[in-house]
């Protein structure tokens, strides 16, 4: 089967935003205008196509990234049909993992901001993730029809809060209830959409007289930004020559693709204005798969030899599995992005990460949660496979005869955990299956069992994250569970270096004995660095034979899981083995493992051990009247207020607060502010816990 749409006419984009910026509504409008959806789904009616889990419709927030495909030929049918693959990503910080995954497989993104709220905390998180993967983006300032809407203030915030270079492509005509359309700053015409047909048709009009000067000013700003794309254009511009529309567009496209500027559009998705022009901007300025650099990877040859794949059907097949979802009808759905080559349903491919072969049973293209079966997918496509057995998020799938491991995604460590048990003994096994299935879907969700108490522990990125997963277990797997009190994921480390710590394990009383003897140094590593643990072998002259060195490393590593101070994982530590002794007959791996763990425990407790606690970045929006109460409460929670910003509706307070002090904060904040304040929080870093706090935690752990 030949390719139906040339790859140059593909756009793989994500739609990303803060909660309530109107992202799902924007996606719905895109589906409507591109002709996929005949009745527009409204989030507040709980019918939006992209929000397909029951819980999402109840809570009105997007939890999983639904992927869907649409075609667009332009507002005035000025383009050949382009294929737009859209990934709708959640805006809540507890689901950052979903955003991270989708950013990894996108070529471009549309950042949706609320014209009233502007750039909010989650917007900054999403921005950092887009920077990490070098994703070119454009912005859409939504909700221009709302009270307090201010387009230019949002443009200014993109500059100051995100340290970006925003360049408006449009300015709004009117605002709040007087918002009627936009001025196209390239054509220098106003666009008015037809309300009778929900904005499908539009007319160009003259720019209203009161906007003429402002439009002129921003038009010049746009032309100057375009001219900076090349010396030739700059010379032309400085020489007073007019730049043609084609020159302006191609120059702006180049600068967007180079991540030098962010083009800003505006509108009101709810009122059917502006989304159409934003879609045109997606086609004109965001990259096709062929515009982005070749995807990097390594060969699975044990030497990590660098390799790459270009977006072409001619190259060997390679794809990245970026999401696993459980479907009630077909079991596991594996969403994947094809970077090169072609794959057909029925083909067998390799998962080089696990060195296993996988067969593509069926391939489906998703439109939110409706699926359409297809025979093949090619470079640039995003689809889902049914029938893959052992693939987890971030795995590569590739041609058997041309293996490559594509760059993996990095997932955050969980910061909160709770104990969970089924309500009935009969559900024990069902709960185990359900939790493992959920952990396979979501790499930031971990399941483990507490060795001492035998309890099952689940860990994740926040209270909401765990609530949603427990809720899904109830609905999808019909398992009722009791959930314990949230526990904080503390860590242990040392503050000082300690040298020449000895560990000796000797049992020699007739017969085969045990003998292991090690001398190690322990030193702290920089906090939050690349590695949590480093082992250095500096043994000379064979005082410990080579075959026992891994056992020493292993003995220390086993101690890291449960630290000597209070049984929490140990981080940021370097161990150096430099001396020891052995016995020809009695030495064994197990003896060296025990000796190493003894030395580690003793050394750790002498090297000024400390407890680390997770610190959260918290942002609170509150009316001014409640400022004093909110700040007073943050101080009581050991919070550190970093700064404040003005909002049309009050203030934004930015603070750092230990996670341990934030449980139940949503309820407390509601009662302090009569429900008028809102907050968001995300993990920031680990800090040393104050000694009185650490002491209480250590004693509580010992009492267990």
Curated annotation (Swiss-Prot):
Keywords: Cytoplasm, Elongation factor, GTP-binding, Nucleotide-binding, Protein biosynthesis. GO terms for molecular function: GTP binding; GTPase activity; guanosine tetraphosphate binding; translation elongation factor activity. One of its GO terms (biological process) is ribosome disassembly. Residues 8-290 form the tr-type G domain. It is found in: Cytoplasm. GO terms for cellular component: cytoplasm. GTP binds at residues 17-24, 88-92, 142-145. InterPro entries: EFG_II, EFG_III, EFG_III/V, EFG_IV, EFG_V, EFG_V-like, EFTu-like_2, G_TR_CS. SMART domains: EFG_C, EFG_IV. SUPFAM superfamilies: EF-G C-terminal domain-like, P-loop containing nucleoside triphosphate hydrolases, Ribosomal protein S5 domain 2-like, Translation proteins. Belongs to the TRAFAC class translation factor GTPase superfamily. Classic translation factor GTPase family. EF-G/EF-2 subfamily. Catalyzes the GTP-dependent ribosomal translocation step during translation elongation. During this step, the ribosome changes from the pre-translocational (PRE) to the post-translocational (POST) state as the newly formed A-site-bound peptidyl-tRNA and P-site-bound deacylated tRNA move to the P and E sites, respectively. Catalyzes the coordinated movement of the two tRNA molecules, the mRNA and conformational changes in the ribosome. PANTHER family: RIBOSOME-RELEASING FACTOR 2, MITOCHONDRIAL, TRANSLATION ELONGATION FACTOR G-RELATED. NCBIfam families: EF-G, PRK12740.1-5, small_GTP. This is Elongation factor G. It comes from Proteus mirabilis (strain HI4320).
């Amino acid at each position: 089967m030949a390719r139906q749409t040339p790859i140059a006419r593909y756009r793989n984009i994500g739609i990303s935003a803060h909660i309530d910026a109107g992202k799902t509504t924007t996606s719905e409008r895109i589906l409507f205008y591109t002709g996929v959806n005949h009745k527009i789904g409204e989030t507040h009616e709980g019918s939006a196509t992209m929000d397909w889990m029951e819980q999402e419709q109840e809570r009105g927030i997007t939890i999983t990234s639904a992927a869907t495909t649409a075609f667009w030929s332009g507002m005035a049918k000025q383009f050949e049909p382009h294929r737009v693959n859209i990934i709708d990503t959640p805006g809540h910080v507890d689901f950052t993992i979903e955003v991270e995954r989708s950013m990894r497989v996108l070529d471009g993104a549309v950042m949706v901001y609320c014209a009233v709220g502007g750039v909010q905390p989650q917007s900054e998180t999403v921005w950092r993730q887009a920077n990490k993967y070098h994703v070119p983006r454009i912005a859409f300032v939504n909700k221009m029809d709302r009270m307090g809407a201010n387009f230019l203030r949002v443009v200014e915030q993109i500059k100051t809060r995100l340290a970006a270079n925003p360049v408006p492509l449009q300015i709004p005509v009117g605002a709040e209830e007087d918002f009627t359309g936009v001025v196209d700053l390239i054509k220098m015409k106003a666009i008015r959409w037809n309300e009778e047909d929900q904005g499908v048709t539009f007319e160009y009009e003259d720019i209203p007289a009161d906007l003429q000067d402002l439009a002129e000013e921003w038009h010049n700003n746009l032309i100057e930004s375009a001219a900076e794309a090349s010396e030739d254009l700059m010379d032309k511009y400085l020489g007073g020559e007019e730049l043609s529309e084609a020159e302006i567009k191609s120059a702006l496209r180049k600068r967007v693709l180079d991540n030098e500027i962010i083009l800003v559009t505006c509108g009101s998705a709810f009122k059917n204005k502006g989304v159409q022009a934003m879609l045109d901007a997606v086609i004109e300025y965001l990259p096709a798969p062929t515009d982005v650099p070749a995807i990097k990877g390594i060969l699975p040859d044990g030497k990590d030899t660098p390799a790459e794949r270009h977006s072409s059907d001619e190259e060997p097949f390679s794809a990245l599995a970026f999401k696993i979802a459980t479907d009630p009808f077909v079991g596991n759905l594996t969403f994947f992005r094809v970077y090169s080559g072609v794959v057909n349903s029925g083909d067998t491919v390799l998962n080089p990460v696990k060195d296993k072969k996988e067969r593509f049973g069926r391939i489906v293209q998703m439109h939110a949660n409706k699926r359409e079966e297809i025979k093949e997918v090619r470079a640039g496509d995003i689809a889902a496979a049914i029938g893959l057995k052992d693939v987890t998020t971030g795995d590569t799938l590739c041609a058997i005869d041309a293996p490559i491991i594509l760059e993996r995604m990095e997932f955050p460590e969980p910061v909160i955990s709770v104990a969970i048990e089924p309500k009935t003994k009969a559900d024990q096994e069902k709960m185990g299956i359900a939790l493992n299935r959920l952990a396979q879907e979501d790499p930031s969700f971990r399941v483990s069992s507490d060795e001492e108490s035998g309890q099952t522990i689940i860990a994740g990125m926040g209270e909401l994250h765990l609530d949603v997963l427990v809720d899904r277990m109830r609905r999808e797997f019909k398992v009722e569970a009791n959930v314990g009190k949230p526990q904080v994921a503390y860590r242990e480390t040392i503050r000082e270096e300690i040298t020449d710590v000895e560990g000796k394990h000797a049992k020699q009383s007739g017969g085969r004995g045990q003998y292991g003897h090690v001398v190690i140094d322990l030193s702290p590593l920089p906090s939050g660095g690349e590695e949590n643990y480093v082992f250095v072998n500096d043994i000379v002259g064979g005082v410990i034979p080579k075959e026992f060195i891994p056992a020493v490393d292993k003995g220390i590593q086993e101690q890291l899981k449960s630290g000597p101070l209070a049984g929490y994982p140990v981080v940021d530590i370097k161990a150096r083995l430099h001396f020891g002794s052995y016995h020809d007959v009695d030495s064994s791996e197990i003896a060296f493992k025990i000796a190493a763990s003894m030395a580690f425990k003793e050394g750790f407790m002498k090297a000024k051990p400390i407890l680390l606690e997770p610190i959260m970045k918290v942002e609170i929006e509150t009316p001014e009247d409640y400022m004093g109460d909110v700040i007073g409460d943050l101080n009581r929670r050991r919070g550190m207020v970093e700064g404040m910003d003005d909002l049309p509706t009050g203030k934004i307070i930015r603070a750092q607060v230990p996670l341990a002090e934030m449980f139940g904060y949503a309820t407390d904040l509601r009662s302090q502010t009569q429900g008028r304040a809102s907050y968001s929080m995300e993990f920031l870093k680990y800090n040393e816990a104050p000694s009185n706090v650490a002491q209480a935690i250590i004693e509580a752990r010992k009492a267990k």
